[in-house]
Amino acid sequence: MNRSGISASGLASWYKIPPAQVLIVYDDLDLPFGALRIRERGSAGTHNGMRSIVQLLGHTDFPRLRIGIGNVPAGWEAFGFVLGKFEGAEATALPDVMDRAADCLTSIITSGMSAAMNTYNKTK
């Protein structure tokens, strides 16, 4: 979703949520499949959806949860990999990854960013 910023900024504006309180969850090619990483702020990197969000929120100072989907396999184009279906072991593991991501979000809300980072920013 290369235009994710339209939705994110629209919701933040509608609900009058400052960018620092908008938590973005997104897939990340630079993390191994299933790895979770929480950051309090940062650049968009190479993620087009995050570029859109940064541009339209006008900030990089917002928290985010990155969910690893692994590197693009040889012979694939990034967009085909990102938009494709999970198969094999990854498809089987995906429900557990999503459960851990949901638990991570709950931890951020109930225990705060630092505690969640200490728990979830570990190697998978």
Provide a role label for each language-model segment.
Residues 1-41, 50-65, 72-77, 84, ...:
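Nucleotide and nucleotide-moiety/phosphate-recognizing core
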Residues 44:
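Conserved TIR/SEFIR loop-to-helix hotspot centered on a Trp-containing motif
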